[in-house]
């Protein structure tokens, strides 16, 4: 169906245009500050070939003719052709015309839809013609039903842009099967999604909205896909998907709506004494107009990634003599097995000569080489065994042999030695000492100890420290913890606890525990620690302080609409989790919240693991439901806040606050403001 969302000029601009026309004759230059108002009207489609709704169409070239010169804006990103095409259509604009030439052969007795969204703009001001689409059929009947809705990212309700939402027709209106397949009817739709392209599809816009045009009567399975390879089917583990649990049966119905035309004058009403002196606008005419009510129109799909990314070795490097960095394309379940084959052609197991520093998902690993024979070698020959995803999608053991060269480090001394000598050199003075008689200076390098969280700690956060290299020795008797009391420093017992994952991090525990608004200091005596390369720790003193209770606010949420199987996250203004609290007895409580601005998100934690979990297509498992509080929370020190939150009171598509949305479509107010500014300069408003 040919549509164009037309915008009427506002009363203000109409009046101002008339005023300007009465005072400024000859202002005919569109968009010129000295030549008239800016053009705000989008192009108007005058004709098309084939015409909208045309049947028995046989040619592959579609022509559109507009009322003014037009241009194309990101047309290949915005164009959607259904049925989906194997070869991309060729789209061109010339003056007032746009042509779309399909490269695939037309299918018989098939309804085609061409959706250009807002890709066509006028040539002067770039006003887009929104909702431009064309429907035609190669047979004598045209299908005209529609399916519409929104696609949101499941974890953060962000609108998903540029994804395909497509359908597979499973059953005719009489219940007979449309597709004969060896799979069972229960899993038919899922199988089609992974094996065949969409039969019809729409593309999501900047708001995540989609519309699938030209649907025939019947029963459908609906999916969404961020298509990584342009084949309109789910065959890459990196692709995000969404699905609807129920089958979709589109419908359309002719309806009428009433438009009231009001009279210019007002009439007094005196139905009762309380109404005396009041006025009502008089109704002039009630006009009825017909429209087609398409259903469904408000579907909400939640996009997710199943997390089944292909595993393979992405990179292995030796940035310096003592490090080996390994990066995998996806998270791993366990560490790889490393064996050194060189130097000296000996097999040395990596566990005995390496210390691994992994990230949380085990896809990025940093190894410290602690054996001097290895880190002094110019070349390391390394054998690595790890899980690799094969062509069948299975994770199987794979062994690679990797050669790593020690990088050449160019110092200033090296550079000076490489420089050619100029002239004859200077003459040695009588009092100069010969180079061979000079005594070289002994330079001792020390390892470093620093705080992870800085000098000011939030209440309840234990102080953590990090050393510059893994430790070989640590004498806790040479570590001293003190707290400040008035002008004195009082000794305290301490525990120095190594991190179970990060080999260079330690947690400091005190007895008794750390107190708010209290200053502490940790002193390490000389040689209290020594790293695996023999570097000692110089005498070090680090001071830190825990914040005062008066630095915080507190907030209590009263949750409605979900059970206790949920948790709430306080979010920063950049949509990042700051704190998390479990919903208990309909409440989520946050204490010791630093002052500032926050937002809130709730996750229905179905498996009670304290984190968001994506869905699973084969298990028909949707991602865990997420809700946003459409409100900014301003937390002040010492204040206690309460907030009632019915998570289902607001439509899901309207829950996420605009301030934390990443995808923010540009508001179309610029040209109105330009006209107002232009007239204001002329003194007309």
Which residues fall in each region the model found?
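N-terminal targeting or signal-anchor segments and their processing/structural boundaries
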Residues: 2-685
């Amino acid at each position: 169906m040919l549509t164009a969302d037309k915008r009427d000029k506002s009363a203000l601009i109409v009046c101002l245009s008339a005023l300007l026309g009465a005072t400024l004759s000859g202002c005919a230059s569109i968009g010129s500050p000295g030549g008239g108002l800016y053009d705000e009207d989008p192009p108007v489609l005058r004709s098309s070939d084939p015409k909208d709704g045309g049947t028995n169409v046989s040619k592959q070239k579609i022509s559109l003719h507009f009322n003014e010169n037009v241009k194309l804006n990101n047309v290949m990103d915005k164009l959607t052709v259904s049925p989906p095409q194997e070869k991309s259509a060729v789209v061109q604009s010339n003056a007032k015309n746009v042509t779309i030439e399909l490269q695939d052969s037309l299918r018989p007795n098939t309804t085609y839809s061409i959706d250009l969204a807002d890709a066509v703009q006028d040539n002067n001001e770039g006003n887009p013609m929104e909702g431009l689409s064309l429907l035609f059929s190669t047979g004598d009947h045209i299908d005209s039903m529609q399916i519409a809705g929104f696609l949101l990212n499941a974890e953060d309700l962000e609108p998903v842009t540029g994804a395909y939402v497509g359908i597979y027709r499973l059953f005719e209106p009489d219940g007979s099967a449309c597709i004969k397949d060896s799979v069972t009817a229960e899993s038919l739709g899922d199988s089609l999604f992974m094996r065949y392209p969409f039969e019809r599809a729409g593309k999501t816009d900047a708001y995540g909205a989609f519309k699938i045009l030209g649907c025939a009567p019947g029963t459908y399975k609906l999916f969404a896909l961020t298509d990584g390879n342009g084949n309109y089917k789910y065959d890459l583990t990196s692709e995000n998907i969404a699905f609807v649990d129920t089958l979709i049966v589109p419908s359309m119905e002719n309806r009428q709506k009433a438009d009231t035309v009001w009279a210019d004058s007002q009439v007094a009403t005196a139905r009762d004494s309380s109404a005396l002196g009041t006025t009502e606008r008089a109704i002039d005419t009630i006009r009825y107009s017909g429209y087609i009510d398409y259903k469904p129109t408000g579907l909400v799909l939640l996009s997710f990634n199943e997390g089944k990314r292909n595993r393979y070795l992405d990179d292995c490097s030796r940035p310096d003599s003592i490090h080996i960095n390994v990066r995998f394309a996806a998270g791993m379940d366990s560490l790889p097995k490393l064996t050194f084959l060189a130097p000296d052609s000996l097999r040395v197991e990596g566990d005995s000569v390496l210390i691994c520093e992994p990230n949380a998902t085990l896809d990025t690993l940093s190894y410290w080489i602690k054996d001097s024979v290895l880190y002094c070698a110019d070349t390391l020959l390394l054998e690595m065994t790890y899980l690799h995803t094969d062509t069948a999608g299975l994770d199987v053991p794979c062994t690679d042999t990797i050669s790593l060269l020690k990088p050449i480090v160019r110092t200033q001394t090296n550079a000076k030695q490489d420089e050619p000598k100029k002239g004859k050199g200077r003459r040695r003075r009588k009092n100069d000492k010969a180079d061979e008689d000079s005594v070289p200076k002994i330079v001792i390098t020390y390892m470093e100890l620093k705080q992870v969280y800085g000098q000011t700690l939030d209440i309840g956060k234990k102080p953590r420290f990090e050393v510059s290299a893994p430790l070989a020795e640590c004498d806790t008797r040479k570590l001293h913890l003190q707290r400040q009391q008035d002008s004195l420093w009082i000794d305290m017992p301490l525990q120095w606890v190594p991190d179970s994952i990060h080999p260079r991090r330690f947690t400091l525990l005190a007895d008794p525990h750390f107190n708010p608004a209290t200053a502490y200091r940790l002193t390490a005596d000389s040689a209290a620690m020594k790293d695996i390369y023999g570097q000692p720790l110089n005498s070090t003193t680090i001071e830190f302080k825990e914040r005062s209770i008066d630095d915080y606010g507190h907030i209590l949420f009263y949750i409605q609409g979900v059970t206790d199987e949920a948790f709430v996250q306080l979010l920063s203004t950049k949509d990042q989790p700051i704190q998390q609290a479990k919903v208990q007895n309909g409440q989520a409580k946050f204490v010791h919240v630093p002052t500032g601005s926050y937002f809130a998100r709730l996750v229905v934690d179905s498996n009670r693991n304290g984190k968001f979990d994506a869905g699973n297509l084969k298990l028909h498992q949707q991602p865990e439901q997420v809700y946003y509080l459409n409100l900014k929370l301003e937390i002040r020190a010492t204040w206690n806040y309460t907030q009632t939150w019915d998570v289902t009171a607001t439509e899901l598509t309207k829950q996420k606050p605009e301030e934390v949305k990443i995808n923010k479509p540009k508001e179309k107010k610029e040209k109105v403001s330009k006209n107002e500014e232009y007239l204001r300069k002329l003194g007309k408003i």
